[in-house]
Amino acid sequence: QPNTPARQKTNDFFVLFKAAQELRPHFENEVLRYLATFESAAPRNTLKGASIKRLARSRQKTAMDYGGDAAMLKDLLRGSVICSDVDDFAKCFRGLAQLERDGVVSIVIVKNRVRDGALASGYIDANCIVKFRDYLVEVQLHLADIVAVKKEAHGAYEAGRELDLMGALAEPPEETPRSHLALNAARLVVLGMCLV
């Protein structure tokens, strides 16, 4: 069913939150630590390890993006691996494929912004939704240089997300003077937030 959106096995928010808490150490040990060392002489940074999305942000995302359907929340449990360069990034993808061959995860969705192009904000990374022990979790792969820039602008990103400006940063489907003006205004708001 290629057009069916990926969903958790339940839409009970509290069941999902409890499962994320129980799965967290296993996800850390079986997935993130494996990726941190796969084809690497020295372990890669995994930022803060496996983390659970904050309750308030999870509820907000469920309400704003998924019409209240918690089964659509695929990144409640997530973890990041920092790659030194594009070659290292490719190694992490090979590691994820190996985890799938070994039956540890099943890859469900891959958004590879290194290969496919940056977000409207200019950010590039890869977000992989995988099924791990019957739940959907997110593996984020980042490039070290991009993470350094992201740290500087994260406050502006969060403010833009809260104001629902991120979609406004994308190129308008049709070029009209008004759409171009709105696009530039949204970009200036985020730029201004970065400078504060």
Predicted feature locations:
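Long beta-strand-rich cores associated with HINT superfamily self-processing modules
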Residues: T62-G192
